[in-house]
Amino acid sequence: MGARASVLSGGELDRWEKIRLRPGGKKQYRLKHIVWASRKLERFAVNPGLLETSKGCRQILGQLQPSLQTGSEELRSLYNTVATLYCVHQRIEVRDTKEALDKIEEEQNKSKKKAQQAAADTGNSSQVSQNYPIVQNLQGQMVHQAISPRTLNAWVKVIEEKAFSPEVIPMFAALSEGATPQDLNTMLNTVGGHQAAMQMLKETINEEAAEWDRLHPVHAGPIAPGQMREPRGSDIAGTTSTLQEQIGWMTNNPPTPVGEIYKRWIILGLNKIVRMYSPISILDIRQGPKEPFRDYVDRFYKTLRAEQASQEVKNWMTETLLVQNANPDCKTILKALGPAATLEEMMTACQGVGGPGHKARVLAEAMSQVTNSATIMMQRGNFRRQGKTVKCFNCGKEGHIARNCKAPRKKGCWKCGREGHQMKDCTERQANFLGKIWPSHKGRPGNFLQSRPEPTAPPEESFRFGDETTTPSQKQEPRDKELYPLASLRSLFGNDPSSQ
């Protein structure tokens, strides 16, 4: 890290660490951003040593700027970092990244005006491409520098590691900046595997070439002296054109950017291949119950990049599906943030959801709510013993018990009022529902019938003495009525049919 961090001196490092990442934000640039930019430049086959000077930063910006329209967020972050570092080298006072980009744009506009003024002064109105790999030598001739093995190695490594994931497309666009059709074919021929994907790419190129020929028919008549023939679809694909013709078309006045046209065809075919290698629809990307929100967002945007849709449709998918397909915990948090929340706010709010810390917080909040509700119910008296009134056995008043009674202690039993024993030893019985003490010490229990019903059949005839004898039941009934005058069911239920 030390070699990469030595890009800035002491004073430059102080100015670097005062610049904010976003206008009005709290985060500022640190050494780790320079280290990150160096590693990304190595991935893009660019010498990271160019960061040490303002001239090198200008060269890096010149290579990255054409790819900003089709590049990824990572490529834009790299461009912003290099632009800020350029302002530090040039001692341009900026407060944040946006001001640095504005300064770079002002310098580029000034340089363009100067170039146009110089061309007008010399009378040369032709705009000659100075982009690599087509450069102008000392004699003023446009020459081509072949694509470097290092660039080819980086491209092959990306294909081997990423196959045809969505990030392959911006990587191809960055490595093929300013390339001729011959350079692009060299990059495609270095891909050893994935021949099925390469065949799909060839079919897409042939379709686009046929469409080009249909929209750009050949003009009848001979070609004027000093002019070049118009390129056909096969010429743009590099199959029927030479390298000199390709350079001539790209540097002609007006130019025909055959390299850029061919690269658009290739990127169109790569989009179809990426779609085939990523069969998962964006509608199927859902956050797992224990999946961190950051991993879910990574999967969501990776699948979104493979979707063949316009930017407006992708923006709608992001605003709707990102929240809709989150798990219940994160969905509750995201809905509370509102529809205007940024991705950074969402990531910060859902950080740690699903982990042990989040579960512990949820459990603690639930326990605190239960405890608070129980305390409130106890304070209001809304508990189980709410309906029972406490009564003192000593003084007979409600609201306290005998243990806490302030009145003089009553002598004797609190139940029967007699002295000589306590309430726990009292033998006084409670009356049953018939109003009698149960069990009865005399005869049958009080809840039994106290009289027997008379039989409806005539009495048995006596053949011994010829006179009727009194039955025992008839003698027992008056005796029972004398012993239990209130035990008849007539006293409880009105007329008793058994006594009639």
UniProtKB/Swiss-Prot annotation:
Residue ranges covered by zinc fingers (CCHC-type): 390-407, 411-428
Annotated positions of the Phosphoserine modification: 148
Locus of motif PTAP/PSAP motif: 455-458
Region feature Interaction with host PPIA/CYPA and NUP153, mapped onto this chain: 189-227
GO BP annotations listed: viral budding via host ESCRT complex; viral translational frameshifting
Region (Interaction with host CALM1): 8-43
Region span, Disordered: 106-128, 438-500
GO cellular component: host cell nucleus; host cell plasma membrane; host multivesicular body; membrane; viral nucleocapsid; virion membrane
Region: PPIA/CYPA-binding loop, residue numbers: 217-225
Start and end residues of each stretch annotated as Interaction with membrane phosphatidylinositol 4,5-bisphosphate and RNA: 14-33
Region (Interaction with membrane phosphatidylinositol 4,5-bisphosphate): 73-77
Lipidation (N-myristoyl glycine): 2
Annotated region described as Dimerization/Multimerization of capsid protein p24, given as residue ranges: 277-363
Region of interest: Interaction with Gp41: 7-31
GO MF term list: RNA binding; structural molecule activity; zinc ion binding
Positions of transmembrane segments: none
Entry PTM: Gag-Pol polyprotein: Specific enzymatic cleavages by the viral protease yield mature proteins. Capsid protein p24 is phosphorylated possibly by host MAPK1; this phosphorylation is necessary for Pin1-mediated virion uncoating.
InterPro entries: Gag_p24_C, Gag_p6, Lentvrl_matrix_N, Matrix_HIV/RSV_N, Primate_lentivir_Gag_pol-like, Retrov_capsid_C, Retrov_capsid_N, Retrovr_matrix
Site positions per UniProt: Cleavage: 132-133, 363-364, 377-378, 432-433, 448-449
Family, as annotated: Belongs to the primate lentivirus group gag polyprotein family.
PANTHER family, A to Z: ENDOGENOUS RETROVIRUS GROUP K MEMBER 24 GAG POLYPROTEIN-RELATED, PTHR40389:SF4
Protein name in UniProt: Gag polyprotein
The encoding gene: gag
